[in-house]
Each structure stands twice: as structure tokens, then as C-alpha cells.
Swiss-Prot record:
Source species of the chain: Rattus norvegicus
Segments passing through the bilayer: none
Gene that produces this protein: Ntmt2
Superkingdom of this protein's organism: Eukaryota
Name of a matching Pfam family: Methyltransf_PK
Name of the protein in question: N-terminal Xaa-Pro-Lys N-methyltransferase 2
Entry annotated with the keyword Nucleus: yes
Annotated SUPFAM superfamilies: S-adenosyl-L-methionine-dependent methyltransferases
Gene3D superfamilies the record matches: Vaccinia Virus protein VP39
Enzyme Commission designation: 2.1.1.299
Reaction(s) the record says it catalyses: N-terminal L-alanyl-L-prolyl-L-lysyl-[protein] + S-adenosyl-L-methionine = N-terminal N-methyl-L-alanyl-L-prolyl-L-lysyl-[protein] + S-adenosyl-L-homocysteine + H(+); N-terminal L-prolyl-L-prolyl-L-lysyl-[protein] + S-adenosyl-L-methionine = N-terminal N-methyl-L-prolyl-L-prolyl-L-lysyl-[protein] + S-adenosyl-L-homocysteine + H(+); N-terminal L-seryl-L-prolyl-L-lysyl-[protein] + S-adenosyl-L-methionine = N-terminal N-methyl-L-seryl-L-prolyl-L-lysyl-[protein] + S-adenosyl-L-homocysteine + H(+)
PANTHER family recorded: AD-003 - RELATED, N-TERMINAL XAA-PRO-LYS N-METHYLTRANSFERASE 2
Amino acid sequence: MAHLGAHFAFRSRWQKTDDELCRHSMSFILHKAIRNDFFQSYLYLLEKIPLVKLYALTSQVIDGEMQFYARAKLFYQEVPATEEGMMGNFIELSNPDIQASREFLRKFVGGPGRAGTGCALDCGSGIGRVSKHVLLPVFSSVELVDMMESFLLEAQSYLQVNENKVESYHCYSLQEFTPHLGRYDVIWIQWVSGYLTDKDLLAFLSRCRDGLKENGVIILKDNVAREGCIFDLSDSSVTRDMDILRSLIRKSGLVVLGQEKQEGFPEQCVPVWMFALHSDRHS
């Protein structure tokens, strides 16, 4: 509660600044740029990081590329195209992650009124760890999308046993990727939503909604902060709390069919949650 009170006081101070003090100043311009990109999270970010530094790390555009995304690409250029690399060197968490994902998916796929088993899309796929262990055993075909060409090249050999079921590899950043309209029974988005700004995550979820077949579902699985929003300087990602995440989901035109916390991870880890989402047009 103390944190929440401080947060509201901080928000009130910034609102006064917006309205009265610096509408035409450089600080207002920087503040407005960050707020445009992180409209749900920016006040939490500003509480932890000075305005000018936060702008330089996120919304500043250099050589046509927003620094929030440029810095993430630099980070992943150094990540090996292995299962260990995909798990951030926490390979011991891979098996409990896969098992929980399989069990969660099973609740929403197959049978009347559920998603079909035709085609799945693996977003932020890396080398295809989730595709190999979770999606390919269930779906007739799978597509992968990732911004790193090196990961997708490795995926072709990593998934070689199932190569006849891999429909295509898309080398795109998710903020630039549009799923085919009405094509997918399941769109899987794991450990990648934090690499999108609030603005781009909202837009991407909306495009994914349009990519679903009738009764299709989006499975969103990611770290969820206990409170507020946390910016990781090392890999240029944000971890949002449940309120922020659910607000973005709602604004994207999706509703939560079910949610479940990942079990079997060490207590010191940031909590990981799974969400099953579908279009509010079918509610």
C-alpha cells in the first residue's frame, strides 16, 4: 500500500507538470514520447530511471531504429542458438516449463467449442523449443516467427525430425509481423511480450486476434511482476504486473478464457503465468 500511495503521488506530480509547468520544454517532449510507447507502464519506469536516461534507453530513435528494440537485438546477437541459450542458461527449468505448457494447452484444444489442431504459430520462437516439445506433437502444421535469422537457421536442423510439419519460418520482429488472417488454431507467445512496448504489444495482440480461426486461442506465457513494471537494462525488456498485462489484453479486444501460474520454478524466480485468450467477439 505504501508503494501504491507513492505511485499515485508521483502520477499526480507528473500530471501537474504536464498541465502547468513544461508543456513546451524538452522534458515534456521526452516525457510525451515515453508515454506514447509505454502508456500503461511509463510512470513505474520513471520512478526507477531518470527521464533522460529512460528516453535514451527506450524511445530515442537512432538510424531509424528505436533504442528499446535496437538494444534487444544487440543482446540476442550474443545468445547461442541452443536450448541453454533459449532458457537464459536456466536449462533445468525447461522440463517443468514444457510439462506445464502441455497441460495448459490441453484444456483449450480439441473437442466441441475448443480450438482445432490444424495450424499453430510460435511467436518469438527462437530455435523452436516450444514448437518441438509442445506444438508439433499436437498440430498438423506449425509456423515459427523470430527476429533472429541465426535462431531460425538452427531451428531447421533442431526440428528436422518434424520438418514435414513445419510450414514456414518468418524472420520478423513481432512489432513488424502480421499473422495471416483467420489462419491459426493457436498462436503461442512465450517469453517475448516484454520485448514489445505497451503500444506495440497492444497492436500485436490485436493482429493475433485477427489471425485466429473460429474458436482459436492465443496462449500468452510470460514473467509477471509482483507489482508495477520492471525494466531489465541487460536485455532491454520490461516485466509487467498482472494489472498492466490484463489491461493491455482487454484493450486489444481479447478476453481471458483461463489463466494459471507456472509451478515447479524456484521461489526466487519472477512468477510466470499462462493466459488463454480469445476474441471478445466470440464471448
